[in-house]
């Protein structure tokens, strides 16, 4: 069922909290892979199916009619994020005139439904649990941090300084190659303004940033 309101979406997300991947997959008649080595997007697909997400692999938000993006957040036993979070691909060409205010990144992060999930690899996939959902909108300070990182990284792209981009740049968000392998190639702008072949780059939220979101939720959650 596709949720028609934020309340319906949150209610559906709360109804699957506490289930294991195996329990939810069996309910939806979805086969469970042994591990995620060849099925990296399986958990996201499972939760999208369970919650009625509409976007599929399109660039729009997962629940575009509600203005909500769905993000899974693998955490360890201490509740700390295990990996960075992919937001969107960076526009490496045809990017003149793009501002933070009309960027894909800002659009995707304007309202997020985070679903924490058990991510420790020693737990068999079928037995990993789904956590309680978190509705999140960036605070003014978080938006300032995201905008600052986005503008710094986009300046390097637009100015043809792709070779200067490293994962160390950015306070809360970084740019990293996005692709199944290093043979994935796209077009970008070279240092002399020419079009070159380069690796696709994606914006990723740092683990420290998503840990902050989790902590804020846990700090205000009633007992």
From Swiss-Prot:
Intracellular or extracellular location(s): Cytoplasm
SMART domains found in the cross-reference section: MutH
GO function terms (MF aspect): DNA binding; endonuclease activity
Gene3D superfamilies, sorted: DNA mismatch repair MutH/Restriction endonuclease, type II
UniProt GO BP: DNA modification; mismatch repair
GO-annotated cellular components: cytoplasm
UniProt function note: Sequence-specific endonuclease that cleaves unmethylated GATC sequences. It is involved in DNA mismatch repair.
Name assigned to this protein: DNA mismatch repair protein MutH
